[in-house]
Regions:
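Short, surface-exposed linear segments at secondary-structure transitions and domain or protein termini
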Residues: 155-157
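Phosphate-binding loop of NTP-binding sites
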Residues: 2-125, 129-143, 159-160, 167-169
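Active-site glycine/GP-rich loop and adjacent strand/helix microenvironment
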Residues: 150-153
Length: 175
């Protein structure tokens, strides 16, 4: 796949990849905006616009925020973003997956297939389908799990507490 080809020419630490049924574009755009404030050369690529492979062929040294669809994930073998974000998983594109939700879930979960213990998976802890998929894959997921929630408190990750955003990462708390 185009994502796979581009990844061959970058360091995984340069890559933040975002997937999910809904919210990919918004999340990718906001992530790009935040990262670009510190690293102005960051590119927003993938399903949202410019090809990741084309961008890499022009300058492989930049950080990349990549919006990745299930279709793109189906073609990966070695793609391993340093940070993977899954916004949610709801029934969509099932015609491509023999109308089997489990096959669609497996496609989305491929984003973490090649991650290591040094990588991160940020995910929506309020999405029961996604939480179940992660629970069912814990023996295969090597990355550090960073949940976010607007409905419950989380020990590690981001949540709302008394109406305020609280982030707990690596024994540090940010409010």
């Amino acid at each position: 796949s185009e994502i796979e080809w581009g990844f061959r020419f970058v360091n995984a630490f340069q890559v933040i990849a975002i997937t999910g049924t809904n919210g990919k574009t918004t999340t990718a755009t906001l992530t790009h905006h935040i990262i670009s404030s510190e690293f102005p050369q960051t590119l927003l690529v993938g399903n949202i616009g410019d090809s990741f492979a084309a961008a890499v062929s022009e300058d492989s040294s930049r950080p990349f925020v990549i919006e990745v669809s299930s279709f793109q994930l189906d073609g990966i073998e070695h793609f391993a973003p340093h940070i993977a974000i899954i916004t949610n998983i709801t029934p969509d594109h099932l015609d491509r997956y023999q109308y089997q939700m489990e096959l669609y879930i497996q496609s989305k979960m491929r984003i973490v297939a090649n991650q290591t213990e040094q990588d991160y998976l940020i995910y929506d802890a309020d999405d029961p389908i996604l939480v179940a998929a992660i629970d069912n894959s814990k023996d295969r997921i090597k990355s550090r799990l960073i949940p976010f929630s607007t409905e419950k408190l989380v020990d590690q990750g981001a949540c709302l507490k008394d109406g305020h955003l609280v982030i707990h990462i690596d024994n540090q708390t940010f409010t």
